[in-house]
């Protein structure tokens, strides 16, 4: 999770005069962990659902509410900067969305510049999915001349000096030779045009999402900055821009809007229009265990730096500031109410319910499945439900499709919820290549599919998967294992030929069966040699996956 470091003096400059001991007590109550501290500074880890707390300005803003210094939604004036930027159609297939804003009257020190860079990189991880979804550029506005153009250029179409370099390079050379270009080349390599932001004179500000130009590098003398946010998700782009702008405004900066001319219309950004959400007083009381009135709910929401108004004795409308991108549901408001009341003051209680315990039906079935697999000589493994598109799709030779993505991943290896167990088993083989053969492993676990009709827009399915690797693993062996598994579970089954990208053509089969109370379906076969190679394995692999419907 993201960790930020700031001095106690930083908080004092932002209106928080608090002794160290009290600060160490208060911060965990706001949803953070204290990583380290000394006489001058503190290192704090915040949960990734609160990207607005990834800067010391955001922390101070929240602290002022928690401590009762200020209540209600902060007000930010946004004036028209007169700056325009045009989004050219040539960039729509690469990185179509752009947000831009001007911040004036900024004051930088060497320490502040470092904090800004750390803030930027934390947002790249938490919202930007390591720049794939969102990338940020911050520039010295006085070094360039508007209006600006966001367009796609050919790999050898222009030269400019990238940040912290002395030589001009083409976009292609940056991807091949510059350290940042090499690290993020995969984001652009499949495209024949690369995004570029240029000014009126053709000078290059940035090559999103790779690197800024040296021309607009921030210094302690910078007084006006231009913030650009590009990405593949318009909502995430606007949210990121709002968080950055309001953070600078907390430090005394003045926000100027930019006219963004897109092919589908014009808009002025940032848009700091708040949104409203209703919360039930009785529901908040039930969830928290507190006896709350509408007035108390309003007061607690205002401590959370929102505005609130009562519409009835049992309903309050919360007015949510644009930088609070974590508020998605009524229960999020209830969480904020509990935090502002101080979670540590809420007494835990045992539920006043008398029941006779009984083992869940699926738990009994789950135990039977494991017993069958162990009896067949398999060893159980447990992998994480979170995986990545690289492992789940590309290494398995699968086309990407609808999936549940992690909105604010803390690692590029954990960006989605799995839809299959097989790649996890192959990763286990990859990590245990040094062990003796044969290796026979299985896993029983949940996967998640998109389901627009459900309340959560998702559907949880339990699957069984097993895999075997040794020098002579083949279709006959996995067919026998599939039959043994299904028969021991009490099903009659039928087998039909199946083509599956992860398996060798002609050596994969679908399995369908009907039981007394449920149905199962799945497939098995010899894993494709390309998949075996993708996981750096040296011997054939056979695998089975069954879904319990």
UniProtKB/Swiss-Prot annotation:
GO molecular function: ATP binding; magnesium ion binding; phenylalanine-tRNA ligase activity; RNA binding
Subcellular localization: Cytoplasm
Lineage start: Archaea, Methanobacteriati, Methanobacteriota, Methanomada group, Methanobacteria
Gene name as annotated: pheT
UniProt: Mg(2+) binding residues: 326, 332, 335-336
Name of the molecule in the record: Phenylalanine--tRNA ligase beta subunit
GO terms under cellular component: phenylalanine-tRNA ligase complex
Organism: Methanothermobacter thermautotrophicus (strain ATCC 29096 / DSM 1053 / JCM 10044 / NBRC 100330 / Delta H)
HAMAP family, sorted: Phe_tRNA_synth_beta2
Similarity comment text for this entry: Belongs to the phenylalanyl-tRNA synthetase beta subunit family. Type 2 subfamily.
Group of enzyme by EC: ligase
Superkingdom classification of source: Archaea
């Amino acid at each position: 999770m993201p960790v930020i470091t700031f001095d106690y003096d930083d908080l004092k400059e932002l209106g928080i005069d608090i002794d160290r001991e009290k600060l160490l007590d208060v911060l965990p109550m706001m949803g953070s962990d204290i990583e380290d501290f000394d006489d001058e500074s503190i290192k704090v880890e915040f949960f990734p659902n609160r990207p607005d707390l990834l800067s010391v300005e955001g922390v101070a803003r929240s602290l002022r509410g928690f401590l009762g210094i200020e209540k209600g939604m902060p007000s930010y004036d946004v004036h028209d900067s007169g700056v325009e930027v045009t989004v050219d159609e040539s960039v729509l297939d690469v990185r179509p969305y752009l947000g831009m804003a001007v911040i004036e009257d900024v004051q930088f020190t060497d320490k502040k510049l470092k904090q800004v860079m750390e803030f930027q990189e934390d947002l790249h991880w938490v919202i930007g999915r390591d720049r794939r979804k969102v990338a940020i550029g911050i520039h010295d506005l006085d070094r360039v001349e508007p209006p600006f153009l966001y367009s796609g250029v050919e790999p050898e179409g222009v030269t400019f000096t990238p940040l912290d370099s002395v030589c001009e390079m083409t976009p292609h050379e940056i991807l091949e030779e510059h350290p940042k270009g090499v690290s993020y080349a995969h984001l652009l390599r499949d495209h024949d045009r690369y995004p570029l932001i240029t000014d009126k004179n053709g000078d290059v500000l940035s090559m999103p999402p790779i690197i800024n130009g040296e021309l607009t590098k921030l210094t302690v003398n910078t007084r006006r900055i231009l913030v650009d946010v590009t990405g593949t998700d318009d909502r995430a782009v606007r949210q990121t821009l709002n968080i950055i702008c309001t953070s600078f405004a907390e430090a005394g900066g003045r926000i100027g809007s930019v006219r963004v001319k897109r092919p589908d219309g014009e808009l002025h950004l940032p848009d700091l229009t708040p949104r409203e959400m209703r919360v039930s007083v009785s529901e908040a009381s039930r969830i928290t265990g507190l006896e709350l009135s509408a007035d108390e709910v309003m007061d607690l929401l205002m401590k959370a730096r929102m505005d609130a108004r009562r519409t009835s004795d049992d309903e309050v409308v919360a007015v949510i500031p644009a930088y609070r991108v974590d508020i998605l549901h009524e229960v999020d408001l209830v969480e904020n109410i509990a935090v502002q009341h101080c979670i540590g003051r809420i007494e835990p209680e045992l539920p006043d319910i008398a029941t006779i315990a009984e083992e869940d039906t699926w738990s009994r079935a789950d135990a039977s499945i494991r017993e069958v697999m162990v009896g067949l000589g398999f060893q159980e493994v447990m992998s994480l439900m979170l995986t990545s598109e690289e492992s789940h799709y590309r290494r398995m030779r699968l086309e990407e499709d609808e999936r549940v993505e992690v909105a604010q991943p803390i690692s590029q290896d954990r960006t989605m919820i799995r839809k299959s167990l097989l790649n996890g088993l192959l990763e286990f083989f990859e990590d245990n290549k040094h062990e003796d053969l044969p290796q026979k492993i299985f896993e029983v676990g949940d996967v998640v599919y998109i389901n627009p009709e459900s309340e959560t827009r998702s559907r949880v399915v339990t699957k069984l998967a097993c895999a075997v690797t040794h020098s002579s693993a083949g279709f006959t062996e996995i067919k026998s294992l599939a039959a043994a598994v299904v028969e021991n579970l009490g099903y009659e089954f039928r087998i039909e030929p199946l083509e599956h990208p992860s398996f060798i053509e002609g050596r994969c089969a679908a399995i369908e069966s009907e039981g007394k109370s449920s149905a199962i379906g799945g497939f098995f076969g010899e894993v494709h040699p390309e998949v075996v190679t993708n996981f750096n394995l040296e011997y054939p692999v056979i695998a089975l996956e069954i879904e319990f419907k």
